[in-house]
Amino acid sequence: MSDRYIDFANSSIGHRLVGALGLPSPVRLERWQAGRLRPVEGALLIGGGPLAARVSAFANRLTDGIYRYGEQPAAASEWIPGHGPKLKAVVFDASELQHTDQLKQLREFFQPLMKNLEHSAHLVILGRAPESLSDPFASSAQRALEGFSRSLAKELRSGGTLQLIYVGDGAEDQLEGPLRFFLSPKSAFVSGQVIRLTACATPVTDWTRPLAGRKALVTGAARGIGASIAETLARDGADVILLDVPPAKTDLDALAARLGGRSITLDICAEDAGAQLIEQLPDGLDILVHNAGITRDKTLANMTPEFWDAVLAVNLNAPQVLTKALLDSGTLHDNARVILLASISGIAGNRGQTNYAASKAGLIGLAQAWAPTLLERGISINAVAPGFIETQMTAHIPFGLREAGRRMSSLGQGGLPQDVAEAVAWLAQPGTGAFTGQALRVCGQSVLGA
């Protein structure tokens, strides 16, 4: 539904009034549009340590306007504060900051940029995982990056975002995929996140259609976020298979026909659901997206056994059982991608949602637990945790709660189903095997669970 407050805050009268009263002033976020060719449309600034040179090697595939601030990379044009162009994207390599005294480089690099960023600018800091370092001082310095990045993300204005990527040993050559996502409008509603990359050798041959030839199954696909995920996967070249309950067959069939895919109606909680699904997937799967989910909200004092059991069965048990069946049967191919739709409620909790929050936290735990084993087959498994997303469900939330949900993030607004779909589509790419066992929040840096 339309966010009328954003419309008002960005009108000439509303902008002045909001500023005078000190109210939140969210802006319309720039999102990926059909026909766009490059991740960054504007100036990209690269600086910092040796990983900056790695980024420089493929930066011309991200944008034409490449600038440097500091010594790295020498091939780029020098950016001069106050004289260079406004910046659309920034990458800073902080991986060699190994002592408290060196942390001042963060202030020295970023302070001059703060008033020179374009609308919806995207910033990324590169580091090394603190737990991988033997020197306590170096580990402390790298851990400090998290506090800095999350705080700076909250200071960005005009729809800006910032992420911290910890680059593991052997993952230095895996940066293009993550930067294509996090420096582009595809990550418009992702901010303040800490990402860990491990070594991965699966390449992407076509960045315009990275999912070409891959078969993708999306559950709960008839409408809402599930439908948006199916549309986005199809846009990126996947052969989509849409699954939902029998009562949703009409909408499901129509969407499948529009996307050139096919539909499956199935009760995923049925005792033989796994066997039925395997039978309908003779060619196997490369991408599995567990989006199907329900809510049955009550405080625990008033929670009925039926409400509890239904939510846990659909949201958690079904993904567990179906994924295991697809793995054991070989239906899920090697180098496949499994994405579980969790929720910010599974991280922060939510009053009246003990059943729902438990189910979504369980999905995050499932991704963490299964990741090491599945990595042996080249399979990655991750959770996506949406925050407040504008859907039919949130449209029925009482006005006061809905407005609070929208404003309680650094970006000051709710996300769109497209935002969740873009995150899923990125995680579905062959080249994202370096990212596994993690939960990616799509929440605009919500204050909940921060």
Regions found by a protein language model. Give the residues of each.
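Short, small/polar-rich loop/turn modules that mediate ligand/substrate recognition or access, typified
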Residues: S158-T161, F189-G192, N335, L375, ...
